[in-house]
Design a protein with these regions (language model features):
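FIC/Doc superfamily catalytic core
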Residues: 1-322
Length: 322
């Protein structure tokens, strides 16, 4: 992938911008990966939990802080971490916040992946590997992954994509399988020199395309147990996700000045709006920037005639002047 060749140049040339992108990505990743699984926290608690030192107040906040801890563990690795069952269990324990009774433990009962039909009925979409066979199957998955990497006959991105897909089909934990799969994605990409997950939230991109994500997952899991499933649609989705991430990475790095990076990101986000927006809309898109900074940038842009404000209080909204 051509963009990977540029990432080292970007890292050397614009460290201040990357610091902001890194902070923004970890906030978005923790929020999106948990929200995909139905775990949400109040907007005003997001930044203190992920970037600050705020103590979790409930189970949802524990899981958000846990995901942050898992990402911190991944990105602090100085050398590639050989994938193994204990690594996956560690990621699960971290992502679950550490206080869940089965954090870091394989499932003890068989599970099913269920979808809700438009009429409200529940339908079994997929039956994962049994609890009894899970430890052996995960061990085999990790061993096959390492062997494929050593053989170098298949491009590493396809090896990573296949590993993540098989992990989702095994569904080795009672809960949190999706989050572990996304953490494993970042860990394995990093081991092959693809650093984009540090700066652009892959979890956010998955959330933004989750209908396609689940459609492809369902399609490609058919006949998985017999080893006769079609994997190419999943590869296409996965590679498209990475391409989008690197394209966004390039746009972010090349379109903002080195200082002050946060203000530039806010300004760039505002100018990209095509409809009305509120201060909280911008703050959600640029979580690395404080609400005070967003207010300051909007005030500056209003003064220079780039945006206008309508209404007051909670009903106030902004609009870009074209």
């Amino acid at each position: 992938m051509e963009a990977r060749g540029k990432q080292d140049l970007w890292i050397r040339q614009k460290p201040e911008v990357l610091d902001v992108l890194r902070e923004q990505a970890i906030i978005q990743s923790a929020e999106s990966s948990n929200r995909i699984e139905g775990v949400t926290v109040a907007a005003d608690r997001l930044r203190p939990l992920v970037i600050g030192r705020a103590k979790p107040r409930d189970r949802s906040e524990e899981e958000l802080a846990g995901y942050r801890a898992a990402l911190n563990w991944i990105f602090s690795r100085k050398r590639a971490v050989p994938i193994a069952p204990e690594v996956l269990r560690r990621l699960h324990a971290l992502a679950r916040g550490g206080s869940s009774g089965d954090a870091g433990e394989w499932k003890k009962r068989d599970n099913e992946i269920v979808e809700i039909l438009p009429n409200g009925e529940r339908s079994v979409r997929f039956v994962p590997t049994s609890a009894k066979d899970t430890p052996r199957t995960v061990e085999m998955l990790c061993r096959n992954y390492r062997a494929a990497c050593d053989e170098e006959r298949v491009p590493p991105l396809l090896i990573v994509a296949t590993f993540v897909f098989d992990l989702l089909c095994i569904h080795p934990f009672r809960d949190g399988n999706g989050r572990v799969s996304r953490l494993a994605t970042s860990l394995l990409l990093q081991s092959h020199g693809f650093e984009v997950a540090r700066y652009i939230s892959l979890e956010r991109l998955v959330e933004e395309s989750k209908e396609e994500y689940y459609r492809v997952l369902k399609l490609c899991s058919e006949r998985w147990h017999e080893g006769k499933n079609e994997i190419v649609p999943w590869w296409n989705y996965y590679l498209g996700l990475l391409r989008n991430a690197y394209q966004e990475f390039q746009r972010q790095v090349e379109s903002v000045g080195a200082r002050p990076a946060k203000s530039d990101l806010v300004r760039q986000t505002v100018l990209a709006r095509v409809d009305r927006f509120t201060l909280s809309d911008v703050a959600a898109l640029v979580p690395a920037a404080s609400p005070q900074l967003v207010k300051k940038v909007l005030a500056e842009m209003k003064k220079t005639g780039k945006v206008r404000l309508a209404g007051r209080g909670r009903g106030a909204w902004w609009e870009v002047i074209r």
